[in-house]
Amino acid sequence: MLIVRLVFIFILLCTQSLAEINISHAIAMHGHPKYDNNFKNVDYVNPKATKGGKVVFSVIGSYDTFNPFTLKGDSVAGIGNLFETLTTSSSDEAFTEYGLLAETIEWPEDRSWVAFNLRKDAKWHDGKSVTPEDVIWTFNTFYWTEL
């Protein structure tokens, strides 16, 4: 009988902990994300806009690094347009992040941790898949080294 009770308590604890985990395409600091997981474009973008062609930007100033994350020096303006991140924000709501390389985001109610589940089609410029090890390496590089 004691074993049955212990198993029952274990199942209840596991069920409770699973119920408290949020899994979503986006995470909002307050309330819920504006856009659901099937949105095709944000409200402030014209989905019928002309696509393709060439765009040229000019910038006044100089740079001494291609690393946009460094605290030392000045990075190239617009360098962030060359890569994707785990999440991205929208310009019409504050404090919400939508999965970009991340297909889903998981977090507990107390927000003590966060997990990102990568899209299967997330690729580097050379066609190789982005792996969890790549994300971990990037995080550790930013967190543990002086850029």
Spans of features found by a protein language model:
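Glycine-/small-residue-rich active-site loops that bind phosphorylated ligands and cofactors
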Residues: 93, 123-124
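Sec-dependent signal peptide recognition
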Residues: 1-9
